[in-house]
């Protein structure tokens, strides 16, 4: 494709701009401890093992929903977690405190940003519009915004598209169509960058976007029959395509 036509660059978030290092395990431990104390406070005796199971269950549910092209608001995810634990407590304060505990754990032990990400976004922002298009988990949209601001990339984007806010997810045509309509551009004037062949590359190509595949693992599942326009090892190679 002709990159000289590009006016908007859409970035995936996880494993494209940020990654989970050792903080992931620390975050999970804090989540488990915080939830156990909270359950005790509300008279629910739940083991650490069961809490971990519930978090894994929600994570799996999120991934399955995303692959199907939709997402749910965080309060619905909390209800799913409580149903998994067989807690029949219809208490808005209880549910809100659970979500706050999970959000707090995310900020306490956040993911790391790739070292070159800020420099690359700064250089691209001088020439292109930028947006962030991310499938999200159980973390609240406002917490994502706070985190992105804390790591210094929130203001690099003209728009943010978070799946648990829009209730649609990559690879759905719908989330990419929203971008198309918001920026009032033609499909060949937009390129999406991401590390997932299915959700990022397949999804963006359905809407006619150009695509850049971040192939950090140096392997492509040819069974998917999905072919990106460009493939790079990591985002440090992105400026070579656009600058």
Which functions belong to the PLM regions below?
Residues 1-9, 19-21, 26, 42-49, ...:
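Asp-based, Mg2+/Mn2+-dependent phosphohydrolase catalytic module
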Residues 3-115, 119:
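N-terminal helical cap/lid subdomain that shapes the substrate entry/recognition surface
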Residues 14, 124-125:
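Glycine-rich phosphate/diphosphate-binding loops that line cofactor/substrate pockets in enzymes
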Residues 112, 127, 139:
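Residue-level signal for short amphipathic helical patches enriched in basic/charged
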Residues 127-128, 208:
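Glycine-centered short loops/turns at secondary-structure junctions
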